[in-house]
Amino acid sequence: MEKIKVIFCGTPQIGADILTTLTEMENVEVVLVISQPDRPVGRKKELKPTPVKEIALKNNLKIIQPVKISEAYEEIAQIESDFIVTCAYGQFVPTKILDLPKIDSINVHGSLLPKYRGGAPIQYAIKNGDSKTGISIMKMVKKMDAGDYYIQESIDIEETDDTGIMFEKLAKLGQKMIKENLLKIYNNELPPIAQNEDEVTFSKNISTEEEKINWNDLSVNVWNHIRSLSPWPIAHTFKGEERYKIQKVQILNNNVEAKPGTIVNISENGIDIQTKDGQVQILLIQKPGKKMMEASSYKLNNLSDLKVGDCFE
C-alpha cells in the first residue's frame, strides 16, 4: 500500500515523542510538521527550538512555525495528506484546516474524554487526586476536545507520580496507541464513539495565581496541588513579599495547634508546615533568586531566612 501521509502539529516533549513514533512507522510519511514559534528561555532569553522542531530537523522534515496557524492555510492546503495528527500543539486549528486531509484530523489527548477537555488535563487529574487517567485518540472538531473518539486506554496514577512523570508515561502510551491504531482508522476499522456530554469536565490552563499553595486546605489536597505543578511551573507560597517555590512534599501524621502555613519544625528531613488538618513536610524548596534545593539544607547548613514560627501566606 501507499504510505499514509501525515501532517503533524505539536510543540512540547509529549508531541515530540508522538512525532518520533510517526517517523519510525514504515507505513507513514510525515509530509509536514507544524509547531509553535521558538520562544526565549532562561535568564538570557535565548531562542530555543520546540522539542517537536528538534525532532523535525533531526529527521529532515519540512516544518513551519506560524504565529497563527490560520495564516498558514494556503501553504498547508498545497500539501496532500491523509491525516492531520495533533498532540499538545497549543493553538486552535480552524475547521478549514481540519477539513483538508482525505481521511481525518485526529488529536492525541491526555485524558479519558469527556473528562478534562482543555489544555491541562494531566495536571487536573493529579490535582484532583484521580487514581487513573489515560489517552484518547479523537476526531478534531471546531469545539475544543468535543469530537468523537476512536479509542481510549487508561493508566494508573501512582502516589509517586507528578505531572512530569505522568507526561512521560502518557507519551509512551500515546506512542503505542498511534502505532497500533492509525492504520485501523485509515482502513475505517475503528468506529468513532460519541462523548457523553453529561459527563464533560474542563481543564483550563493554570494561571499564576492558581499555582499558589492554599495551606488552609487538607494535607492531601496540598500534596496533590504541589505534585500537579511539578516539575513545572512549580507551586509557590509567600513569606511576606518573598516568594518561595515548593516542588515536593510528603504528608505527615503529626498535628499541632497552629495557624495553617506555620513552620512547626525544621529537621534533617525537611521543613514541617501546618495545614488545615495536619502537616506536610517540604522536601524540595527554592529560595528567591536561588536554585531548587533539598529542604534538609536548612537544618544542616543553619540557613536563617526561615525559622520555626514563621508563617507562609
Curated annotation (Swiss-Prot):
Query: Looking at the keywords, is Disulfide bond present?
Result: no
Enzyme Commission code: 2.1.2.9
Source species, domain of life = Bacteria
In its keyword annotation, does this UniProt entry include tRNA-binding? no
Q: Which Pfam families match?
A: Formyl_trans_C, Formyl_trans_N
Q: Which reaction does it catalyse?
A: L-methionyl-tRNA(fMet) + (6R)-10-formyltetrahydrofolate = N-formyl-L-methionyl-tRNA(fMet) + (6S)-5,6,7,8-tetrahydrofolate + H(+)
Q: Which GO terms describe its cellular component?
A: cytosol
Which UniProt key words apply to this protein? Protein biosynthesis, Transferase
Q: Which CDD domains match?
A: FMT_core_Met-tRNA-FMT_N, Met_tRNA_FMT_C
Q: Name the positions where (6S)-5,6,7,8-tetrahydrofolate binds.
A: S111, L112, L113, P114
Stated role = Attaches a formyl group to the free amino group of methionyl-tRNA(fMet). The formyl group appears to play a dual role in the initiator identity of N-formylmethionyl-tRNA by promoting its recognition by IF2 and preventing the misappropriation of this tRNA by the elongation apparatus.
Give the protein name, as stated in the record. Methionyl-tRNA formyltransferase
